[in-house]
Amino acid sequence: MDNTTEKKEPTKVPRRRFVGKRKTDGKTITTVKADGNEVVRQTKSRVHVGRSLNHIPDDIMEDEELNEAIKLLPQNYNFEIHKTVWNIRKHGAKRVALQMPEGLLIYSLLISDILEQFCNVETVVMGDVSYGACCIDDFTARALDCDFIVHYAHSCLVPIDITEIKVLYVFVTIAIDETHVIKTLQKNFPKGSRLATFGTIQFNPTVHSIKDTLLNDKEHMLYIVTPQIKPLSRGEVLGCTSERLDKNQFDAMVFIGDGRFHLESSMIHNPEIPAFKYDPYNRKFTRERYDQKQLVQVRGEALQVAQKGKVFGLILGALGRQGNVDTVRNLEEKLIKAGKTVVKIILSEIFPQKLAKFDKIDVFVQVACPRLSIDWGYAFPKPLLTPYEANVLLNHDVMFSEEYYPMDYYETNGYGRGRIPEHALVKN
C-alpha cells in the first residue's frame, strides 16, 4: 500500500496588472469578512495641491545672499521677501509695482533693490496715498506697463481674480511682546472676563496667539473671542467693516494696534460694549470712547437737509478700487425712481473745496469710503451721504440710532461690494 500523500497544487490566481505607483503614503484599512477572510484596502492620502504649489523652493529659502539682504530690513517686520521672490519668478514677471502705505515707504527702495537683484525685474514704487486694501491700484500699475503688483500692509479685500494684473498681498505682520499683552489684560480684567479681541492685519498673529494662552491659564483665565465678519480674517477689523457683537455675550472689546481709526469702526457698530486699546508701540492700555450721540445727531441732520434735495451728485471713488460701479448703478436707479436728478461724478479724492464748485447740486452721495462722511461730513457745504444713508433716505434701509449704526461696508453682502446687506428693507 502506497502511503505517499499526493501534494496538492495551490490554486493559481491570475496576477493583477499593475497600474500606477507602488509606493503610497495612504492609510491601510483591514476588514474581516464573515467567512474569516481579510480584505486589505489601501486608501489614498489627501494631496494638498495648493500647499504644494505655494511651497517656496529651498534654493530661495537657503539663498545666503538673499538672506543677508533681508537682514537689512527690521527683523520684527515680516515683509515675506522669500514668498515675494518666489511668486515673481513663478509668474515670470518683468515689471513689478510696489504699493504700500506712507509709513512703510521708508523701506520701499531697499525692497526694490532686493527684488531687482534676485528676480531680475524692473520695479516701480507707487507713491500715491494708500489708505487701505480698497486702495489697491492695479489699474495704474497696468497703465505703467507693470505685469505684477505687490500690495503691502493690507488684507485681501479685493479678490485677486478680478484685478487687471497678478497681485500679491503681503500683510507685513509685526512681532510684538505677547507676554506684556497677556499680563496687561490679566491685570485690567477680572478672571473669567469675556473679551472680543481684534486688531489690524499686522497684529493678527498676536490676537490668535494670546487666545489659547489666556484660556488655559488656570490662575487668571480670560475668555478670548476673535470675531469675524466675512470675508475678513478672523480677528481682523477695518475702519469701515467690523462684526456686530451681542452685548450680552461680552464684557469688553480689546483692540490691538495703533491709532483709533479701525477701532472706531467696532465702537460705532457696538456702542454698548466698553472698548479698550493696547498700543504695541508705546505698550499703553487705554479705555476708549466714541460720541455715538453726536454721530447720530450730525448724520441725522444731514439726512434732514437731504430730504429737500432735488439734484443729487453721485460720486464714484477712483482712488484704487474704492468705488463700486454696481453700487453706483443701483443708487442711480433708486434716485431716478424717486424723482431725483442724478449727476455722476468721478473723483480720486473728495475735498470740501472741490465739491463746493458744484453749486447746482443739492446733495452728494459718495461711493468711496463711508468714514469720509461719518468723520468729515460736517465740513462739507452740502450733505455728503454714504450708500447706506442714501438708502435710509429712500426708505430702503433701517434708520440708525444711538444703539445701532451699521459698519459692514465690505462684508460679503455689503454696499462696498455692490450688494445689498441683510439689514436693508428692500432687497434690490
Curated annotation (Swiss-Prot):
The lineage of its organism: Eukaryota, Fungi, Dikarya, Ascomycota, Saccharomycotina. One of its GO terms (molecular function) is 4 iron, 4 sulfur cluster binding. Pathway: Protein modification; peptidyl-diphthamide biosynthesis. PANTHER family: 2-(3-AMINO-3-CARBOXYPROPYL)HISTIDINE SYNTHASE SUBUNIT 1, DIPHTHAMIDE BIOSYNTHESIS PROTEIN. It is found in: Cytoplasm. [4Fe-4S] cluster binds at residues 134, 240, 369. This is 2-(3-amino-3-carboxypropyl)histidine synthase subunit 1. Belongs to the DPH1/DPH2 family. DPH1 subfamily.
